[in-house]
Amino acid sequence: LQLYISKTDAYSEIGSFYGFGHQQAFLGYESYILEPDTNDDANTTYFSNLANCTFDQEYIYATRGYNGKITFNAAVQYEDNLFLGLNLNSHLLHYDRSTQLFEDNTNAGSLINNIDFQNTLATFGNGFSFQLGGILKVTHEFRLGLTYDSPIWYNIREETTQYVSTVDESNKRTIINPKIVNIYPTYRLQTPGKFTGSLAY
């Protein structure tokens, strides 16, 4: 007895076991954009069902998001000569990107005449940083300043979704919409830190 595996389940399992690249091959194969040279599991070569010639393409790219910061600060003064300040920062990051590619062709020999390929990416992150600075009044007229901006230590995770549809030479539409959210492992990102000095007289 052979169990039926839906395209949604297949897309999900391919992503879990083999990764993003294999999911792209799956979408191309199931939407008839690509065909394997041979129908066996060991095959690694494919050919396109679109004949070379002229293509009309439209590409839509949309982004939105925010990068926010919440700051807690404290300051102390020693006599009238030394001033110290500290900022503790909590960073929030959210970024959405959506892309859509439309492609049409009337090329002789093309089995596929229309492609609609959509991708979304959602990025979520939070981070921490601090600033520490001081001003030293050497004399009444002369001041030295030094500030350290720490790196921002981010924890970031990303999610993607995909959709593809094609129309073949007989005007039959094939839609591959897995409705699967690919959630990738959280990774860390660190921006550079810096020192800033100043003199005033």
List PLM regions with ranges.
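Outer-membrane beta-barrel porins/channels
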Residues: L1-Y201
